[in-house]
């Protein structure tokens, strides 16, 4: 549980110790810097569902409202991508990289593959939905996995999708339907 107060331990007249609230707000920048001196300033006071650093050293930050991209430690501000840019949905659940250095993003409504052109660093988006073989609906926070052969497993509420980068295809894995017997 996060606390909104800082407490100070003081001795009273009976020489016993008393814990009293101090009149210092914990959300002040000075207190945050003292509590988290080595924390990157970009990530303070924000809500992130998932963070992923790819093989380029770029950090992708999934938020409830878009995908942020930090390409270096010196970035003054991240690039931010939304549904209008090509994401399936703005609520980012998971991020993973495939063996071809494409970034896969699971959201609250579908999957997006992000391709970065190695020559000019241009970014393009490909959405996958139920018609492409992806699960319909919401994916689960950080339910992404890459196996040793490069296969990606993307977990959703109703099962998971399997992506084989070599075949450029995505396959849903749904739970087995119930079997009724008499």
What kind of region is each of these model predictions?
Residues 62:
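N-terminal/domain-start segments enriched in small and hydrophobic, helix-friendly residues
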Residues 8, 13-17:
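Surface-exposed loop/turn elements that mediate protein-protein interactions on large endomembrane-trafficking
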Residues 12, 55, 73, 99, ...:
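Short, ordered coil/turn segments that flank beta-strands lining enzyme active or ligand-binding pockets
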